[in-house]
Curated annotation (Swiss-Prot):
Entry protein name: Phospho-N-acetylmuramoyl-pentapeptide-transferase
Enzyme class: transferase
Localization terms from the record: Cell membrane
Entry GO terms, CC: plasma membrane
Cofactor: Mg(2+)
Highest classification ranks of the organism: Bacteria, Bacillati, Bacillota, Clostridia, Eubacteriales
Keywords from the UniProt entry: Cell cycle, Cell division, Cell membrane, Cell shape, Cell wall biogenesis/degradation, Magnesium, Membrane, Metal-binding, Peptidoglycan synthesis, Transferase, Transmembrane, Transmembrane helix
One Pfam short name: Glycos_transf_4
Parts of the chain that traverse the membrane: 13-33, 57-77, 85-105, 121-141, 143-163, 179-199, 201-221, 238-260, 303-323
Gene name per UniProt: mraY
Taxonomy, superkingdom: Bacteria
PROSITE patterns hit by this protein: MRAY_1, MRAY_2
GO biological process: cell division; cell wall organization; peptidoglycan biosynthetic process; regulation of cell shape
């Protein structure tokens, strides 16, 4: 543990954290008025919480802020193109591009219909297969089983399972991004968990990237926390999902996302349960899905929701350390 703390206090690590944070803080006041001027505003669903309707027109695609911040930070740190940290950066960019295209089309069409489902699926499959192949050839097909102190070799099933894993993780983070600051806050904690594990297990570059992205998200939160001046959009949420999935994959810990990313999982399950129940019985289990909207309908404020979900994530990350 002492060595891990030393790594966290390493000048390079601290520089990555501070640079990511500083770049986001600087870019926020540049991007927000620029996106306003371009009329890149969020279209709010009329079937969502009524309190959200006043947010219509809030600049979206804010993921570009931490997207650029962490990219510049990693370039300044001067990692080689084949380093693990850069592989995570590539995945952030790849899935961020999908989100960017989705956001742009939503803005052009002035509705919530961006990329068609099949178009998004094709792009997700292409990037997921490429990353799964990278994992198969460079990382190995074994993954750590939580609480068991053992590994499971996926063998020939590795690539198809990893492709499904990427689709699930990116969409789960996307669903979590439904209220001001929620996805950002939860993901900062998850990234910190993986950064510590990265340093502890010798994956220094992954640890540095995780810290840099956490710093960039903290800077972004200055503008994304309630009341949000900017939304991350699919540009941000899909990029974050792709990055987290790759970080966990390199650490051989994809199963740990079920634990430390428990909020992502619950958000996704709430949608699946709601849709399944309505289609089979005509009844809804929740007042609204994803589940953060259910709690909003129950009278919870966005600030309370973000605080409670963040505390839960912190507890889940502690459980994650126990599961190692």
């Amino acid at each position: 543990m002492g060595d891990t703390i030393k790594e966290l206090l390493n000048p390079t690590v601290l520089s990555a954290l501070l640079m990511g944070f500083a770049f986001s803080m600087v870019l926020g006041p540049i991007f927000i008025p620029m996106l306003h001027k371009l009329k890149f505003g969020q279209n709010i669903r009329t079937d969502g919480p009524k309190s959200h309707l006043k947010k219509s027109g809030t600049p979206t695609m804010g993921g570009l802020i931490f997207f650029i911040s962490v990219s510049v930070t990693m370039l300044i740190i001067e990692y080689k193109p084949t380093d693990e940290g850069m592989i995570v950066l590539y995945s952030l960019i790849a899935f961020g591009i999908i989100g960017f295209l989705d956001d742009i089309l939503k803005i052009i069409h002035r509705d919530n219909l961006g990329l068609r489902a099949y178009q998004k699926m094709i792009l997700l499959l292409l990037f997921s297969i490429a990353l799964a192949y990278y994992g198969y050839t460079n990382i190995g097909t074994d993954i750590i089983i939580p609480f068991m102190n053992s590994k499971l070799n996926l063998g020939i099933f590795y690539i198809p399972l990893v492709v499904v894993y990427y689709a699930a993780t990116t969409n789960a983070v996307n669903l979590t991004d439904g209220i001001d600051g929620l996805a950002s806050s939860v993901t900062v904690i998850v990234l910190t968990f993986f950064a510590i594990v990265g340093f502890k297990t010798g994956h220094y570059q992954v640890g540095v990237f995780s810290i840099a992205l956490a710093g960039a998200l903290l800077g972004f939160l200055r503008y994304n926390a309630f009341p949000a001046k900017i939304f991350m959009g699919d540009t941000g949420s899909l990029a974050l999902g792709g990055a987290i999935a790759t970080i966990a994959l390199i650490l051989k810990m994809p199963l740990f996302i079920i634990i430390v990313g428990g909020i992502y999982v619950v958000e996704t399950l709430s949608v699946i349960i709601q849709v399944t129940s309505f289609k089979t019985t005509g009844k809804r289990v929740f007042k609204m899905a994803p589940i953060h909207h259910h709690f909003e309908q129950c009278g919870w404020s966005e600030v309370k929701l973000v605080t409670v979900f963040s505390i839960i994530t912190l507890i889940l990350c502690i459980i994650g350390f126990i599961a190692l």
